[in-house]
Amino acid sequence: MSSRKKVLLKVIILGDSGVGKTSLMNQYVNKKFSASYKATIGADFLTREVLVDDRQVTMQLWDTAGQERFQSLGVAFYRGADCCVLVFDVNNSKSFDALDSWRDEFLIQASPRDPDNFPFVVLGNKIDVEESKRVISTKRAMTFCQSKGGIPYFETSAKEAINVEQAFEVIARNALAQEESEEFSGDFQDPINIHIDNDRDGCAC
């Protein structure tokens, strides 16, 4: 299996500004946490080599500015994604309410071949904050995920490295499954299109 080619997995991380997207990425890739990250401008990415079911893969994690007007990044930013991670702050109801619009935005821009089965993962971040300040319960978050077809849900703390590794293991596994299904589908896509074009040419003659 070691002779199989390496795979690049593109993972898009979406969510409101301040929910901890950059912190989660840095905790996962660099095992570091800083309380003084500057707001991400546009988009940035980090990579990490991981082993998923005996496959050597490179995770390319894309962090975005959590602003509604970053469509200027364009379709190219979303296209080719193998998994989308939706992040909210369990202490901020607005960031939770925005998950639907982030999910819709991704599906519109990325235009995955099979949107109903495209892999999403939801992360409820900042669980290190004292329980009394928490506003989004585990039950409420899980209900949302179930309503969207059973999206995997993890409660994380980038600050204390809680569940970060476990969440990204599932993200990597789901992204790899998506990448492999896209490769399989792609084997048939071009011949079908060429056949249609040839038929049209024949009719024109």
From Swiss-Prot:
Activity control note: Rab activation is generally mediated by a guanine exchange factor (GEF), while inactivation through hydrolysis of bound GTP is catalyzed by a GTPase activating protein (GAP).
Binding-site list for GTP: 17-23, 33-40, 66, 125-128, 157-159
UniProt-recorded Gene Ontology molecular function terms: GTP binding; GTPase activity
GO biological process: regulation of vacuole fusion, non-autophagic
Disruption phenotype: Exhibits defects in mycelial growth and production of conidia, and consequently fails to cause disease in rice and barley. Shows impairment in autophagy, breached cell wall integrity, and higher sensitivity to both calcium and heavy metal stress.
Lipidation (S-geranylgeranyl cysteine): 203, 205
Entry superkingdom: Eukaryota
Assembly information from the UniProt record: Interacts with the Rab GDP dissociation inhibitor GDI1.
PANTHER family associated with the record: RAB FAMILY (PTHR47981), RAS-RELATED PROTEIN RAB-7A (PTHR47981:SF20)
Stated name of the protein: Ypt/Rab-type GTPase ypt7
Protein source organism: Pyricularia oryzae (strain 70-15 / ATCC MYA-4617 / FGSC 8958)
